[in-house]
Amino acid sequence: GHAAANCALARVATALTRRVPASRHGLAEGGTPPWTLLLAVAAVAVLGVVAISLLRRALRIRFRYSKSIQTLRV
């Protein structure tokens, strides 16, 4: 599942980076509709939740390995 999640994150990141210059242009002109901002905020929130969950999994795995290593050292 990690590979699929990373692939999805990469796709979303590329999509966001492609749309960022256009949105910046709109912000400079002052003509961005609020729903695009809402979509951007929602996308960031979803990415944040996914990133946090992946980080928690990685930390759990690391803690398991570190515990096993400590027991092996002792």
Curated annotation (Swiss-Prot):
Keywords associated with the record: Membrane, Transmembrane, Transmembrane helix, Viral envelope protein, Virion
Topology relative to the membrane: Single-pass membrane protein
Keyword Membrane assigned: yes
Domain of life: Viruses
Chief localization: virion
Virion surface side, ranges: 1-34
Subcellular location: Virion membrane
Intravirion membrane side: 56-73
GO CC terms: membrane; viral envelope; virion membrane
Spans traversing the lipid bilayer: 35-55
Family: Belongs to the chordopoxvirinae L1 protein family.
UniProt-recorded name of the protein: Protein F9 homolog
Organism: Orf virus (strain NZ7) (OV NZ-7)
Lineage summary: Viruses, Varidnaviria, Bamfordvirae, Nucleocytoviricota, Pokkesviricetes
